[in-house]
Amino acid sequence: MVEQNLLNLTVLFDLSDRLEIVLTPSQMERDTAIVNYLVKQFQYECTKNKNLLQCKNAMRVLFYPTPQISDVANLANNLDIDLAKCQYAEKKRALVDMPQNFKESLAAIYDKTLQQKQWVGSDIWGFFSNNKVDQYCIKQDYRNVVVILTDGFLYDKYNKQNQNGNEYSYLLPQTLNVE
């Protein structure tokens, strides 16, 4: 039985060329606005019953696959809050610091990704078909919510699936070459 007051919120980010400023100049602002809204909702859910001491909610930001840029992986650690693992004073501090930590860490992640121009993308197909969603996003007895920020492409260079010669997990210009 899911307790309605336990929230496990996961945001899956697509670090693809959708972040390229030339292609989509306002993408960072839009993503940041969405995450800021989710952070405010998370804070509200944690404090609405005035029982922060008992609150065990969790929120995290994921990148799948994990970027090879070590700074991004380190910054992502700032985007993981699990109040079940915190004492009361830590919970209060985590909630107070959360908006600024998320804002600064996301800005730094975007900056590092844009500097490196290593568009790892997001293997959404693999994330769901290989049960990574269960591993990373599902907590028993929680209301589990997964928000995906992507341009919708399922393509990942490490997960190219071609079944029966005409069913693909991706679509590239080369795929359409008909002879």
Which residues does each predicted region cover?
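VWA/integrin I-like adhesion module and closely mimicked acidic/polar interface patches used
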Residues: 153-179
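N-terminal post-signal-peptidase region of extra-cytosolic proteins
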Residues: 37-47, 127-132, 169-178
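Catalytic metal-binding/acid-base residues of hydrolase active sites
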Residues: 16, 152-153
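Von Willebrand factor
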Residues: 4-81, 85-142, 145-147
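Short, surface-exposed linear patches
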Residues: 32-35, 82-85, 168-172
